[in-house]
């Protein structure tokens, strides 16, 4: 089932998400719905707060990137209760967009290496270092679980330059090709 994506201004996007227990109701169905919603909106990642749920669940599907990055062929994973334990490597700037910020794309600096823990869809524990593009996508999505958005990493000048677009979203005027839930 395709779910509406919550757009900038929705309070759930600024709340810290909670870890869930292994018996969380309908978890597999939720994950399937998140993948379907994300794919319909042409996203590569989706965090549960973006569909209105303040829980620590993220889906990432990087198969679309596999022409340029062959290591992501058939890469499709769910991350349950993910946490970043440590960051490393160098800070790399790359343009990011977000399904909750339609029409906004800005360069964001992030570490290119992270140490993460999470449960997979089978509730198996993982503790690993991740680097490169996947590390960036994870940081972007995991930010949502901490009540942050990529615009929080921008300079005051860049924030000022997108103020009009953010204001339009607050008025319920998000322009995109997928189903959204605005505050108006």
UniProtKB/Swiss-Prot annotation:
EC number: 3.5.1.88
InterPro entries according to UniProt: Peptide_deformylase (IPR023635), Peptide_deformylase_sf (IPR036821)
Pfam family, one: Pep_deformylase
Active site (record annotation): 141
Reaction(s) this enzyme catalyzes, per UniProt: N-terminal N-formyl-L-methionyl-[peptide] + H2O = N-terminal L-methionyl-[peptide] + formate
Comment on bound cofactor: Binds 1 Fe(2+) ion.
GO molecular function: metal ion binding; peptide deformylase activity
Example GO biological process: translation
Cofactor(s) needed for function: Fe(2+)
Top-level lineage group: Bacteria
Residues reported to bind Fe cation: 98, 140, 144
Swiss-Prot/TrEMBL keywords: Hydrolase, Iron, Metal-binding, Protein biosynthesis
Described purpose of this protein according to its UniProt entry: Removes the formyl group from the N-terminal Met of newly synthesized proteins. Requires at least a dipeptide for an efficient rate of reaction. N-terminal L-methionine is a prerequisite for activity but the enzyme has broad specificity at other positions.
PANTHER family: PEPTIDE DEFORMYLASE
Family: Belongs to the polypeptide deformylase family.
Designated name of the protein: Peptide deformylase
Lineage: Bacteria, Pseudomonadati, Bacteroidota, Bacteroidia, Bacteroidales
Gene (UniProt): def
